[in-house]
Amino acid sequence: MRLPGIPDEEFIRVEKIPMTKEEIRVLALSKARLFDGAKFIDIGSGTGSVTVEAGLVVGEKGKVWAIEKDKDAVELTKKNVEKFKLNNVVIIEGEAPEALDHVDSEVDAIFIGGTERLEEILLSSDKKLKNGGRIVIDAILLETVNKALSTLNQMGYKTDVIEVIIAKGMKTSKGYAMISRNPIFIVYGEKP
């Protein structure tokens, strides 16, 4: 098992396809509580950065399903999975929640990076999640946080949320300046 924290620059990138940044991936995956042999779904895989990190954490005995509706993002996820030589990833081109029908197993954790149709996705995700499993949602909007918490609470999940504000060092001619990134909310819930 490998701990998450691959530098962002190691991923193949395309400008219009968003990527969950390194520090956020580390925190989100820690909230997912992955382990060697775990089964995991990444909904809205984008560049595949969360998919790759999860694939490395769960190891050869584990399995990761990456769901993505954008054709270009699917191709980018494939390229990053190939770059990191992962054999435990299944990439599903399709839109959640319908694409969840292609996941043939109960899973230990689910990450939701795209927030369209969030309530429907959460309700469908619940059917794929083992008891004691976790759903983790990244969000930039307060409305998304409210909808995620409200839905998870109605489903009987034990929930919490953190706000993450990261500043990265930028080298200048006189030293380092700290440049803030946008705040991110990480909502997580544990299935009873």
Swiss-Prot record:
Catalysed transformations (reactions): Co-precorrin-6B + S-adenosyl-L-methionine = Co-precorrin-7 + S-adenosyl-L-homocysteine + CO2
Annotated metabolic or biological route of this protein: Cofactor biosynthesis; adenosylcobalamin biosynthesis; cob(II)yrinate a,c-diamide from sirohydrochlorin (anaerobic route): step 8/10
Keyword annotations of the record: Cobalamin biosynthesis, Methyltransferase, S-adenosyl-L-methionine, Transferase
Binding site for S-adenosyl-L-methionine: 20, 44-48, 68, 96
UniProt xrefs under InterPro entries: CbiT (IPR023475), Cbl_synth_MTase_CbiT (IPR014008), Cobalamin_biosynth_MTase (IPR050714), Methyltranfer_dom (IPR025714), SAM-dependent_MTases_sf (IPR029063)
EC number(s) from the headed UniProt entry: 2.1.1.196
Highest taxon in the source lineage: Archaea
GO biological process: anaerobic cobalamin biosynthetic process; methylation
GO molecular function: cobalt-precorrin-6B C5-methyltransferase activity; protein methyltransferase activity
UniProt-listed Pfam families: Methyltransf_31
Enzyme's top EC category: transferase
Record carries keyword NADP: no
Entry annotated with the keyword Transferase: yes
Family to which the UniProt record says this protein belongs: Belongs to the methyltransferase superfamily. Archaeal-type CbiT family.
Protein name: Probable cobalt-precorrin-6B C(15)-methyltransferase (decarboxylating)
The species this protein was found in: Sulfurisphaera tokodaii (strain DSM 16993 / JCM 10545 / NBRC 100140 / 7) (Sulfolobus tokodaii)
